[in-house]
Amino acid sequence: VESDFFDWVVDVPKGDSFVRTLARRIARFDWRAVEHDVLKVLYESVISAETRKKLGEYYTPDWLAQKVVETAVPAPLTTRALDPSCGSGTFLFHMVRRYLAAGDKAGHTMAQQLDGVTRNVVGMDLHPVAVTLARVTYLLAIGPERLAAERNPIRVPVFLGDSMQWRNARSSLWSAHELRVPVNDQRELTESEFVFPQSLLADPAAFDELVSQLADRASRGRKHGARPSHNALFLNLAIPEDAQPAITATFHLMCRLHDEGRDHIWGYYIRNLARPEWLARPENHVDVLVGNPPWLAFRHMPEDMQADFRSMSEARGLWHGKKYATNQDLSALFVVRAMELYLRREGGRVAFVMPSAVLDRGQYEGFRSGTYAGAQDQLNLQVALDPPWDLREVRPHFFPISASVVFGARAKTASPMPE
């Protein structure tokens, strides 16, 4: 298990005893019988309603998530899907189960299924608690029997990351065929950077292993101030000679940060900041985006976020000011931004749960057009929108406001949302 924001519990007095006691209590449950995202209730009890409102989080009922996944992912074995706002993992659960059921039907071995599902079903969220729970939900969807079978090591592909990439709207971490990850802890006048040659990111599992080993060597079994050789690591992981100087510099930076007492989760930080950037590379785009974006209203956004939201919305033909300004929310921009960044250009499909206002209200007029001007590095993002699901008549309401489900595909020519 990698170090993250929550591993402090094993470093405090009696922390290991607490973990063992908790594990015994959790073991009382029959986790083989799980048929839905059981952790969303835990998330909603840990994160206050006020905080969830500020984040625009409204959790999707499992029956709806299952129906959306069945519609959006008809061929799970050959479809790479991303939930860019995965929360506790509701959509991920049903995508994993759908993939494994198809794998069983196709006669795939357990190892083939686990390798395939972790390649084809990916999640991302901005909230570290949600990401931790979503990773557990992902494993529950796989199930204890599959996890106990003979298999290769797996890394759960659920990442802590800013899917919107607000900070990179005008810039990127990529520079001259390198990934440059800033330390960004506000403790240096000149910001240091971890540098990784682009060639090392082609294989996500190999990159994760490299970062994990660098972080482990920097934080364990090393005398203060020492910079041990890592030639064996270069050999074991087949690091090309031309990439070794950058990796050496990155390792020395990790050692310095550890010696200065500046956190010990740099490996976790690098992997999770790198993953949105990696997914945004054209060669890594997914076939389907599915999920429930944040429904954060403009009037509830912080001022600096309001300014960025307006600027990015105007550039994509989504801003409708005057009487509509306070009624706009993040969901439309989030969906368009996710399509720009992560969806393959020809035929990539989307399926998102959104407020029902998207169907006919003025603040969503630009979204319903299917043409989003100024998107990313192109003049226009064109989307052919399909007939939506209008859930306004569903009772009881499962969100504070009524909902819909929007479907569409990237296309050469836009098709407005059918009325």
PLM region descriptions:
Residues V1-L100, N120, M124-A130, G161-S171, ...:
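Preference for the N-terminal adenyl/adenosyl cofactor-binding alpha/beta module
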Residues Y58, G107-M110, Y324, Q328:
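Flexible, glycine- and charge-enriched loops at secondary-structure boundaries
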Residues W63-L64, F93, L100, L126-V156, ...:
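Signature of N6-adenine DNA methyltransferases within the class I
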Residues A101-K105:
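Post-Walker A helix-loop "phosphate-sensing" segment adjacent to the P-loop in P-loop NTPases
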Residues L179-S219, K412-E419:
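Extended, charge-rich low-complexity interaction segments
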